[in-house]
Amino acid sequence: MAQGDDNKQAIGQIIRQEQALIFPSLDENDAFSLGQRIRDIAVKDKLGIAIDISLWDRRLFFAATAGATADNIEWLRRKFNVVRRFHVSTYRLVLEQNREDRMFAPYKALDVADYALAGGGFPIRVSGAGVIGAVIVSGLPQREDHNLVVRAVAEHVGQDPVALALPAA
């Protein structure tokens, strides 16, 4: 199958993820539980990552595991800005934009210092409220960052993470 076809299938699956992974509500306790779930997976699998769960106006959860770097923290911020701007998964945008340089097209006027075209940011969509924030992971290859977030969010909201997972690249 051609790369373009693979991307189209992955984009379709990510759209299904975004439609299925809706929180009934989200408060500080939910954010802590979800963040701890991601951290537990990372510690068990020895993944060096940084984790951020934020609403548009404030951070609710942050953690880093052994192996995470200061660069990962900066990537969290830039991925958050992308989710805030577009209200979709950052990996979806990576596949839609199909750019090797990880920068948005110049006509979008998005400074690379503030916006990263890289997987690992996922919108927090609350039933009846819409997108209110983002769950972000940084430290793994971008598809793995995305898959880790989707797995944890799916488990948190009672969806089957296997059914929603992207196929191996």
From Swiss-Prot:
Pfam families: HbpS-like (PF03928). Transmembrane segments: none annotated. InterPro entries: PduO/GlcC-like (IPR005624), PduO/GlcC-like_sf (IPR038084), YBR137W-like (IPR010371). NCBIfam families: PRK02487.1-2 (NF002693), PRK02487.1-5 (NF002696). Belongs to the UPF0303 family. PANTHER family: PTHR28255, UPF0303 PROTEIN YBR137W. HAMAP family: UPF0303. This is UPF0303 protein BOV_1367. It comes from Brucella ovis (strain ATCC 25840 / 63/290 / NCTC 10512).
